């Protein structure tokens, strides 16, 4: 089975001393993928996203705000989200890598394509960045895949400990996008209740399963097994994109869920099986949160193992 790792050291220019969203996160996750796949891993070069594709999601005025902040030597979009010289190029690489991963998986070039990038993206909305995020990488990738005729009905799986408020807001009225999320609640950003099910024509395509602090593998796995994976199956997507955050891990310093590597492997296995059942070419992932380096490495490795095992269970003979 083919695995792609899409990562680029150019994203490391986006850094602020003492900030938890730091460059060595990328290295830890990339090492986790390499641990599992070894010499058979493909690492194609990353191509930065073009502005036209970014503007399918983000307002041009917001992009100008980012560019202006860089030109002034940097600044803060909110108390959590910084811009420094090099941040805009890092965001372009992050979105570009996520689009490459999405295309590789949707076309069958890779069974698993993991964009190991930063800054993360799922809190970024059309006109603002927040929660460490500048561009909404998964949203831009989805729009780019559609624009290139690669996929039309797309499911977004989000297991970050924080609800992906930006992603949900962008697609909640779109009936051709299914958004499924587990996240800690109550917690930042304060959205993601079970009653948030989409709006307008998109009612019924948003699925939130908030988990209380202290929840571990049992609750995490059950939410996906019993509710979210069946909802995605009923939606019948022709591509799956995963917002892979690992801050629900029990060792993460910024949250209070108790998920382990085994929990991520189990849920990834379900997604792998589902992708094979649907006849999809593969599964694409993009890095979101996660701030303990050892947990990041182990969880990324567990995710890739789970996805490959799930896909093999249906695509390879005994």
Regions found by a protein language model. Name each.
Residues 1-318:
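HDAC/HDAC-like amidohydrolase catalytic core signature
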């Amino acid at each position: 089975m083919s695995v792609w790792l899409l990562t680029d050291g150019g994203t490391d220019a986006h850094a602020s001393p003492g900030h938890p969203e730091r460059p060595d996160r990328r290295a830890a996750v990339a090492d986790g993928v390499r641990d599992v796949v070894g010499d058979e891993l493909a690492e194609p070069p990353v191509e930065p996203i073009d502005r036209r594709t970014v503007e399918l999601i983000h307002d041009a005025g917001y992009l100008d705000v980012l560019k202006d902040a860089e030109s002034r030597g940097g600044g803060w979009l909110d108390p959590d989200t910084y811009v420094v010289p090099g941040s805009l190029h890092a965001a372009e690489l992050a979105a570009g890598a996520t689009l490459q991963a999405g295309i590789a998986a949707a076309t069958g070039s890779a069974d698993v394509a993991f964009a190991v990038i930063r800054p993360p993206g799922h809190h970024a909305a059309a006109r603002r960045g927040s929660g460490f995020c500048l561009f909404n990488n998964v949203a831009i990738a989805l729009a780019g895949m559609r624009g290139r005729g690669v996929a039309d009905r797309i499911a977004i799986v989000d297991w970050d400990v924080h609800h992906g408020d930006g992603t949900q807001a962008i697609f909640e009225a779109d009936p051709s996008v299914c958004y499924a999320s587990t996240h800690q609640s109550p917690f930042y950003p304060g959205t993601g209740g079970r009653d948030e099910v989409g709006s307008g024509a998109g009612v019924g395509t948003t699925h939130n399963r908030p988990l209380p602090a202290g929840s571990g593998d049992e609750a995490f796995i059950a939410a996906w097994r019993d509710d979210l994976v069946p909802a995605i199956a009923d939606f019948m997507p022709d591509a799956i994109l995963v917002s892979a955050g690992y801050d629900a891990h029990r060792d993460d310093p910024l949250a209070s869920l108790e998920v382990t590597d085994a929990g991520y492997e189990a849920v990834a296995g379900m997604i792998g099986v589902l992708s094979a059942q649907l006849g999809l070419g593969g599964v694409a992932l993009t890095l979101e949160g996660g701030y303990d380096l050892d947990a990041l490495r182990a969880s990324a490795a567990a995710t890739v193992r789970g996805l490959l095992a799930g896909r093999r269970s249906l695509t390879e003979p005994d």
